[in-house]
């Protein structure tokens, strides 16, 4: 894949990548698929090789979904905390694979776990990124009733990122589920307001609202296609941009 050699030619120089837990399990029903995680790590390395500063927020849905557990009777706050622990497992797994490729990586958790990763401290996270280390944010926001999408938006804003890249199972935002509706319309660009008004399920409303308030653009794309992250950051490939 041909890369842009001059970082100054790129509009976005500091990015946050949101990776769902489901993306890490590949074709499995649960857990991790190593080859899939390795491909994601290789894709991230391509972005680093462009000279960008990279942060990541990872979900935990491949291991545990707090909202689903709450639906069957578990206390929602307790279920969400378990889900946060799942994101730490995923972050450590991704870190291990990335470091095997020579990528300097740090995991910072919103829930302190001193034996396995660093606690989230904003200044420390920014310093890691300045040193070209990839920072993986785990533990969501550290609070129940908040999604990892909300955590991704908050961390992107705190790190002064230029854009949030949301890696999904489809190649952008549609007016309905393209897996169920073959005639679903895809948007190349769409406003925050239209995402909220049309109840599009790309992110929860709170996350979109915070992104809008802070003018953080969001680019939605498919993580299934190898090399897609670097293409998308260079305005190539298939994606949808959410902005004002």
From Swiss-Prot:
Is Transmembrane found in the keyword set?
Answer: no
Q: Residues that bind ATP, according to the entry?
A: 18-21, 61, 65, 168-169, 174, 177
EC number assigned by the record: 2.7.4.22
Look up keyword Protease and say if it applies.
Answer: no
UniProt keywords (A-Z) are: ATP-binding, Cytoplasm, Kinase, Nucleotide-binding, Pyrimidine biosynthesis, Transferase
Q: What is its main location?
A: cytoplasm
InterPro entries, sorted: AceGlu_kinase-like_sf (IPR036393), Asp/Glu/Uridylate_kinase (IPR001048), Uridylate_kinase (IPR011817), Uridylate_kinase_bac (IPR015963)
**CDD domains named in the record:** AAK_UMPK-PyrH-Ec
Pathway membership of this protein? Pyrimidine metabolism; CTP biosynthesis via de novo pathway; UDP from UMP (UMPK route): step 1/1
Q: Which family does it belong to?
A: Belongs to the UMP kinase family.
Q: Any idea what job this protein has?
A: Catalyzes the reversible phosphorylation of UMP to UDP.
Stored NCBIfam families: pyrH_bact
Per its record, how is this protein called by name?
A: Uridylate kinase
- In its UniProt entry, the species of origin is given as Rickettsia typhi (strain ATCC VR-144 / Wilmington)
